[in-house]
Amino acid sequence: MALVKVKPTSPGRRGMVKVVNADLYKGRPFAGLLEKKSKTAGRNNNGHITTRHIGGGHKQHYRVIDFKRTKDGIPAKVERIEYDPNRTANIALVLYADGERQYIIATKGMAVGDQLMNGSEAPIKSGNCLPIRNIPVGTVMHCVEMLPGKGAQMARTAGAGVVLMAREGTYAQVRLRSGEVRRVHIECRATVGEVGNAEHSLRKIGKAGAMRWRGVRPTVRGVVMNPVDHPHGGGEGKTAAGRHPVSPWGQQTKGKKTRSNKRTTSMIVSRRGKK
């Protein structure tokens, strides 16, 4: 995997940096693990915009990812590493000894031909999935469950990883990349190692059109709107907002706490620090 700076043959390519991975499979994805994915353009069933800046983009299929990894004791072999347009991480197509194929998140250093295993008897090896109670303290993990059997929810993005800090009774403490420390049940499953494609954060899109291919529409600043459209709008000439930054609906938009899930607050040992 390498970072390639594109020659400035046009304004859109000036400054563009691509992530090139020669090991990615160049054919079509495995048809048995594809599902239809329809566009919403950010609208709900009434046609009202519920999420701004979404629309257009290339047609995509959803790749069904196995986030539960419950085929215990059956060895699997990595057939190929693929690009997935639905996430920043790459995915791996694995073939189990019983003939079933599944997509999983590709770990750092994973290559075609690697042997993987799920379950409590699996060795501590990058790409293997097992309960946290069987993973040594200090191990870097990803695809961590928050509830036993629910499937991986934490550390699924490119380059992500959490560190197993301690085990106490039926719970373990894991440190997330944000610095937050959470309690997780020891029966929750996690995959050993970091998520691959960490260079994804170093790429530079280069032009607005590349974001339109991804289905992202422009974001217009509130200060250039009219007062009817945004609280920051209006004024003669170029003027400041005249107030603390707010959303188009008047809610504070920088730094306001939005978390309201009190049910799981007890699972947070320490909140993330300010950057």
Curated annotation (Swiss-Prot):
One of its GO terms (molecular function) is rRNA binding. Keywords: Ribonucleoprotein, Ribosomal protein, RNA-binding, rRNA-binding. It comes from the Bacteria. GO terms for biological process: cytoplasmic translation. GO terms for cellular component: large ribosomal subunit. SMART domains: Ribosomal_L2, Ribosomal_L2_C. Residues 224-275 are annotated as: Disordered. The keyword Ribonucleoprotein applies. One of the primary rRNA binding proteins. Required for association of the 30S and 50S subunits to form the 70S ribosome, for tRNA binding and peptide bond formation. It has been suggested to have peptidyltransferase activity; this is somewhat controversial. Makes several contacts with the 16S rRNA in the 70S ribosome. Belongs to the universal ribosomal protein uL2 family. Part of the 50S ribosomal subunit. Forms a bridge to the 30S subunit in the 70S ribosome. This is Large ribosomal subunit protein uL2. The lineage of its organism: Bacteria, Pseudomonadati, Pseudomonadota, Betaproteobacteria, Burkholderiales.
